[in-house]
Amino acid sequence: MSSAYSVRSFPVSIPAVIMETDWTEPWLLGLLAFHLLCLLLTCFSSQRYKLQIGHFLCLVVLVYSAEYINEVAAVNWRLFSKYQYFDSRGMFISLVFSAPLLFNAMLIVIMWVRKTLTVMTDLKTLQEERKERRRRRKEE
């Protein structure tokens, strides 16, 4: 079976990578399932702060490790893949591995910012109510 693309002629654009990838390979389907599980954990961990922090740190560590994972996968691709997808620039690993993880991390940060704004709004409301009660007591 011929290669989807060789390392020398690896596509430089995201649409080319997406179009030339065999998305039916079992390891890619497993990676997709992993990303879906990460997304579910991101969504359902919003009420469990410690779990969300741990999940966020795992996401960041995995993204940080992507270069090493790419190097190992480039050497051992025949063990799990039909084609050599792992180029020296890291385009493929960035697209199929790091980008979804960074998306999850971004969602978590958005949740944290939203939660912080909600707490700040609630605090300001309580301060205003307290100020109003003091003013009323003073008038009496």
UniProtKB/Swiss-Prot annotation:
It is found in: Cytoplasm; Nucleus membrane. It comes from the Eukaryota. A motif (Nuclear localization signal) lies at residues 130-138. It is a multi-pass membrane protein. Keywords: Coiled coil, Cytoplasm, DNA-binding, Membrane, Nucleus, Transcription, Transmembrane, Transmembrane helix. Residues 1-25, 74-91 are perinuclear space. Residues 118-140 form a coiled coil. GO terms for biological process: cell migration; eating behavior; energy homeostasis. The chain crosses the membrane at residues 26-46, 53-73, 92-112. Residues 113-140 are annotated as: DNA-binding. Residues 47-52, 113-140 are nuclear. One of its GO terms (molecular function) is DNA binding. GO terms for cellular component: cytoplasm; nuclear membrane. Belongs to the TMEM18 family. Transcription repressor. Sequence-specific ssDNA and dsDNA binding protein, with preference for GCT end CTG repeats. Cell migration modulator which enhances the glioma-specific migration ability of neural stem cells (NSC) and neural precursor cells (NPC). PANTHER family: TRANSMEMBRANE PROTEIN 18 (PTHR22593:SF2). Forms homooligomers, independently of the DNA-binding domain. This is Transmembrane protein 18. The gene is Tmem18.
